Design a protein with these regions (language model features):
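Alpha-helical scaffold domains
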Residues: 1-241
Length: 241
């Protein structure tokens, strides 16, 4: 599928969604979801849907979620991302519900990289307030998505010095999750720390030293292993004592 085709499909699907014709909209989209369509093209469809009225878009996205296709989570994630400026609180409520509905790692990661991740990049402080309850959510996938969002922010930061203070804020934010024990959630937390360590290695080394050496906090070996991935030998020694 070419970009123009994806945009045209998105416009057609969005028009049906806005008209309240949910079944017809999904029938139009379903063949594309069944094919090997790139996430970028699916994202264009999602953006078109998300640009429309919230109520009809939500009804359609719930229909997409019920089908459970991998590509469907991309459409949902990009649609929610398109709604962030209009309804940030509502988007986070809906995103959490979709993460729980997905109940699988790739659905969680797709949504985490398209909703809370970009929200952190766009507006860090208000987003942290919305994301804070997810750190201790009863659902492991919701907790995992916090780490995915931090990974996305770190990737976009590219290690620029001007973002160092924000990186410090994010390390403080994920500190309560260092003792996460459920392995699916641990992988998300570790991913976030790994990418922060890639771009801000000294910062992460000092932070790990506080958790591991000074406070001797209980943690999964996987969490620490991922966090150490991009650190130098000297930084690893500093981090682990």
């Amino acid at each position: 599928m070419k970009t123009r085709q994806a945009r045209e499909l998105g416009q057609r699907v969005a028009a049906l969604v806005q008209a309240g014709q949910t079944d017809q909209a999904y029938a139009l989209l379903a063949p594309t979801l069944a094919e090997r369509t790139s996430f970028r093209m699916l994202g264009l469809v999602g953006e078109a849907v998300g640009a429309g009225p919230l109520e009809t878009a939500t009804t359609f996205l719930e229909h997409v979620a019920a089908a459970g296709s991998m590509g469907g989570w991309v459409v949902i994630g990009k649609a929610l991302g398109e709604q962030l400026e209009r309804d940030p609180g509502g988007v986070f409520v809906r995103c959490r519900a979709f993460i729980i509905a997905a109940d699988v790692w790739y659905g969680t990661d797709i949504l985490g990289e398209r909703v809370p991740g970009p929200a952190l990049v766009a507006n860090l402080t208000p987003t942290l307030a919305l994301l804070a309850p997810w750190r201790e959510d009863a659902n492991r996938w919701v907790r995992r998505s916090v780490g995915v969002a931090v990974h996305f922010w770190a990737k976009r930061s590219r290690g620029k010095a001007e973002h160092t203070a924000q990186a410090e804020t994010l390390l403080a934010f994920v500190e309560p999750m260092f003792e996460e024990w459920e392995i699916d959630a641990v992988k998300g937390v570790g991913w976030g720390l790994k990418t922060l360590g890639r771009h801000y290695p000294d910062l992460v080394a000092d932070w790990l030293a506080q958790q591991v050496v000074q406070r001797q906090r209980r943690h999964r070996k996987l969490t620490l292993r991922k966090a150490l991935t991009f650190l130098s030998d000297e930084q690893r020694t500093r981090a682990t004592g």
